[in-house]
């Protein structure tokens, strides 16, 4: 089993996967990538590069093989690994760098800092890489507070030491204090402590060289809430040696040798990181609290770990999940600044729901509309439709007026009722027997031959009723077979050209009779002028043909 000292990561139990548990899915791929980025032996395989949070996979096959070994999947390859990395795109954990092969970038600004592991931070002797993640501080630490405040840890037990080494309690506690002083009075908070237990502006050189007393803390260490080894992973990693491969820079506070702020990573923002970005106003050094711990000793910025403070602390952690889009490095929690709680969005939609419900019955009953008139939206009536509203207003108005005797509403309704009946006449005119139509048309054609078209002047007398007939004639013509329609048109064209097709005169007349018979007698009152012209042309061509035969 891999020891915590080998990894150097402060994973909790749910995020740490030892190699001795095959098939376990507790470790995530991006946790594993952070592990590889921190180890010196894998610098030729994967390394930080380029912009802030960016890393390049130099040997994709080797990274996939290592991931397969870790997950007990020997068939792992880079294709499967890249699909797993693409899964993190929507999670806003990392994304692919465009234009660069095998290059990805962690979204440390968008990451929910509660969800990614805190990389153990030591004294980096070398230069900080440009792509290093942000400096973790009071609010951005990977912390898991104790589940119950009843778990009490003795102040002499070193939470960062193995349980076997906790026998000499006083020496271990002194070592903890000395180690914290050596890294600039900053705690990684994985041991359940807060970095604000120590004064921010105090010069570490003013402290005695020996083991510091308990009075060096602003509050008694007995007030610290404990942590369970099941909740926090205990790491006995020494803090004295330099860690040039750590992606985090040196402590954000002043080191033992100077009072000036340290040199930060060039990828960090310009906001003052020496001020603790904490999840609760009580943790902020600007919080004007009068008392310190439960014993009353200490300055104003002491986090006493009282039940009230812990309640606010846990509430702030749950709130950070809802406000994950806010960067904890760029959002200072001031005492006067009120951050909306997670339950407020549930209350916000309630006020608009009240005015939305009354307008629905307002259209049905006048009493409800009068009661809800002050809450009615101006833009709500138009979506109902102007025609529907007009019809709704006319319907009750017409009934009232008809009962009163005015009759104006009845006329409007009558006009609306008269409009639809026009289609029935078209249906009644269509069914006409062919025999009757042929007989009628035969007599008409015989009259044309005898009286030279005189008979067509008498039917023109009634022009009033045939007005709807022009709409009927095309409808009847559409019902006519295409063959007869084109034959009739061809015969008329031939007649207009001057008798070029008179060789089959009787047959054409017979066909024309059939076509005219299909049209029906009702058409005689409609298109009279073209039929008269065609008859005149027919007689003229007949006379010309007789003259040619005689000659």
Curated annotation (Swiss-Prot):
Which cellular compartments is it found in? Nucleus
Check the record and name the InterPro entries matching this protein: Ets_dom (IPR000418), ETS_fam (IPR046328), WH-like_DNA-bd_sf (IPR036388), WH_DNA-bd_sf (IPR036390)
* Residues bearing the modification Phosphothreonine: 3, 7, 443, 529
DNA-binding region at which residues?
A: 27-107
Output the PTM entry.
Phosphorylated by multiple kinases including MAPK1/ERK2 at THR-529. Phosphorylation regulates the activity of ERF.
The residue ranges flagged as biased composition, category Acidic residues, are: 433-453
Segment Disordered: which positions? 130-169, 184-304, 342-476, 495-551
Result of knocking out the encoding gene: Mice fail to undergo chorioallantoic attachment and labyrinth development and die in utero due to severe placenta defects.
UniProt lists compositionally biased (Gly residues) regions at 289-301, 404-413
Family annotation (Pfam families): Ets (PF00178)
Q: Mind naming one GO cellular-component term on file for this protein?
A: nucleus
Q: Which domain of life is it from?
A: Eukaryota
Expressed in which tissues: Expressed along the osteogenic margins of the developing calvarial bones, in a similar distribution to that observed for the master osteogenic regulator RUNX2.
The record's Gene Ontology biological-process terms are: chorio-allantoic fusion; ectodermal cell differentiation; in utero embryonic development; regulation of transcription by RNA polymerase II; trophoblast giant cell differentiation
Record field: compositional bias (Pro residues): 239-250, 348-361
Q: Which UniProt keywords apply?
A: DNA-binding, Isopeptide bond, Nucleus, Phosphoprotein, Repressor, Transcription, Transcription regulation, Ubl conjugation
Query: Could you tell me where the Polar residues compositional bias lies?
Result: 535-544
PANTHER family reported for this sequence = ETS (PTHR11849), ETS DOMAIN-CONTAINING TRANSCRIPTION FACTOR ERF (PTHR11849:SF31)
Function text: Potent transcriptional repressor that binds to the H1 element of the Ets2 promoter. May regulate other genes involved in cellular proliferation. Required for extraembryonic ectoderm differentiation, ectoplacental cone cavity closure, and chorioallantoic attachment. May be important for regulating trophoblast stem cell differentiation.
Say which family it is in: Belongs to the ETS family.
Give the protein's recorded name.
ETS domain-containing transcription factor ERF
Q: Which organism does this sequence originate in?
A: Mus musculus (Mouse)
């Amino acid at each position: 089993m891999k020891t915590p000292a080998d990894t150097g990561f402060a994973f909790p139990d749910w995020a740490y996967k030892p190699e001795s548990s095959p098939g376990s899915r507790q470790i995530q791929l991006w946790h594993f990538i952070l592990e590889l980025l921190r180890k010196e032996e894998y610098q030729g395989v994967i390394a930080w590069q380029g912009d802030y949070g960016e890393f390049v996979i130099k040997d994709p096959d080797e990274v996939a093989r290592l991931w397969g070994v870790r997950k007990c999947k020997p068939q792992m390859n880079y294709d499967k690994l890249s699909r797993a990395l693409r899964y993190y795109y929507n999670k806003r954990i990392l994304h692919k760098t465009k234009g660069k092969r095998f290059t990805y970038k962690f979204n440390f600004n968008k990451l929910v800092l509660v969800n990614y592991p805190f990389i153990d931070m030591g004294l980096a002797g070398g230069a900080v890489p440009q792509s290093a993640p942000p400096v973790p501080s009071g609010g951005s630490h990977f912390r898991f507070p104790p589940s119950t405040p009843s778990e009490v840890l003795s102040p002499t037990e070193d939470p960062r030491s193995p349980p076997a080494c906790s026998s000499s309690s006083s020496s271990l506690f002194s070592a903890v204090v000395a180690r914290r002083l050596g890294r600039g009075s900053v705690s990684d908070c994985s041991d359940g402590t807060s970095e604000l237990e120590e004064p921010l502006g105090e010069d570490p050189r003013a402290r005695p060289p020996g083991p510091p007393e308990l009075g060096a803390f602003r509050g008694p260490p007995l007030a610290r809430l404990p942590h369970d080894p099941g909740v926090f992973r205990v790491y006995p990693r020494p803090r004295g040696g330099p860690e040039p491969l750590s992606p985090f820079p040196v402590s954000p506070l002043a080191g033992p040798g100077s009072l000036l702020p340290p040199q930060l990573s060039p990828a960090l923002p310009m906001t003052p990181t020496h001020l603790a970005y904490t999840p609760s106003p009580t943790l902020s050094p600007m919080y004007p609290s009068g008392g310190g711990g439960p014993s009353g000793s200490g300055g104003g910025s002491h986090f006493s770990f009282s039940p009230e403070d812990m309640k606010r602390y846990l509430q702030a952690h749950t709130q950070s999940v809802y406000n994950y889009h806010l960067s904890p490095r760029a959002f200072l929690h001031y005492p006067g600044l009120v951050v909306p709680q997670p339950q407020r969005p549930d209350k916000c939609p309630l006020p608009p729901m009240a005015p939305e419900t009354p307008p629905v019955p307002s259209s049905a009953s006048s009493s409800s509309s009068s009661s809800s008139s002050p809450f009615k939206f101006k833009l709500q009536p138009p979506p109902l439709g102007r025609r529907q509203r007009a019809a709704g207003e006319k319907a009750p108005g017409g009934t009232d007026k008809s009962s009163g005797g005015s009759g104006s509403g009845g006329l409007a309704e009558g006009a609306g009722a008269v409009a639809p009946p026009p289609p029935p006449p078209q249906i009644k005119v269509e069914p006409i027997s062919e025999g009757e139509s042929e007989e009628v048309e035969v007599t008409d054609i015989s009259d044309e031959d005898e009286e030279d078209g005189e008979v067509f002047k008498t039917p023109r007398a009634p022009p009033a009723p045939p007005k709807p007939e022009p709409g009927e004639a095309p409808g009847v013509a559409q019902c006519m077979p295409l063959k007869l329609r084109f034959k009739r048109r061809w015969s008329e064209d031939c007649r207009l050209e001057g008798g070029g097709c008179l060789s089959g005169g009787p047959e054409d007349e017979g066909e024309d009779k059939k076509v005219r018979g299909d049209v029906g007698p009702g058409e005689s009152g409609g298109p009279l002028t073209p039929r008269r012209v065609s008859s005149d042309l027919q007689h003229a061509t007949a006379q010309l043909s007789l003259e040619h035969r005689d000659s």
